[in-house]
Amino acid sequence: LYLLDKAAVHRYVPAHLSHKSAWVQAESVSSMYLGEQADSLRKMDFIQDINRDGLDDIMLPHFEHLNLWLSDCCGARHPQNLPIAARIEMNQSSVSYDDQEIYFQDMNSDGKTDLVTVEQGQLNVFLQNDDMRFSDTATKIKINKTIHALNWWDIKGENGQEMDQSNIQHRVVREIDDFNGDAIPDIAVQFTKSSGVLDKTIDFEFFYGALKEGKLHYSEQASTSVTSEETLSDLTFLDRDMDGKQEVSVSSFDIGISQIVGALLSGSIDQDVLIFSMDENDKFGKAPLVSQEVEMTFSLSSGTQGQPLATMIDINGDAVKDIVFSDGEDLIRTVLATPDQKNPYAKSSLRQKIPMPKNPYDAVTEDINGDGKTDLVLHYGSADSPELLKRVLVLLAN
């Protein structure tokens, strides 16, 4: 557990024997987070094992560069600056800075993890050297020139205005990883098409990497895609049966006048969680492997909303992930995987009554007791009743 303030990173040392717990300074740092006192705590991934040596490194954005503190085997950290500037946005009376998305992948097949950023039409790769530091100059890899690093609503025109929603065709990178199990990084892209505020379609495209003369290359056309007649969102990846190929989980919902009116009257909106898998040619199927309906709730009076729990974990230790999802405010269901290729999931679900958090988005899935089955830890938040705020719910698979 680490804590960042204006000038330092602190590490939490738990109590042990006669020693009390304490916060100790781990490193003096500089970053663009310059506030003297924060109004609230925020979770950030500024501690990473960047060079995959098993040691905690520090990564913090500054206004004009990215600051790294790389750990060595003796406990020291070595600083390095990379020319990765924060993104600046200027309005009439304010200026804001956002850090760039950083991806960690081996981009030249040398067994070392490299740092990757995206700009329109290309990847910028900071290769890791033999001394575990990174090159100060980026190697550029061309990708489809319509692929962006930013969402369409973050892109401003020459006059400073946002994009016209009556005519949007926009691709943005959502993930860089090896999806088809060939040890070569691939690119997942969200493709948004819009002819109006209520007339949007969102698909996901996948550009598989290939080696040509020893160098990483991406084609102009997507290798495969996940599509639906409804709007897709919440792209996540999982290896359902541990075969090295990633399945895709997306949420699907319909946006229209009738759906909006119905949601306002009922205080909830139905959405489907769809799981797509690859075939033997690394193509995603047109139909999902499985579809599960869940419900999202909201309150116009309080301004709060409730997100459903929907995750895939192996709860019975058979090395195949099962589906776990919430059903209302006090029920959790589990659909077990089956060995049947035509019907990969059971038709009925297991049920358990528990007081579900309104927003279980930060649910932790880990094998807590080492029995080979994945357990579930749920946290309550501000949308839940006051008596639940100090509780943590631990569900052990059995």
Could you say what each language-model-derived stretch is?
Residues 1-398:
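Beta-propeller-forming repeat regions
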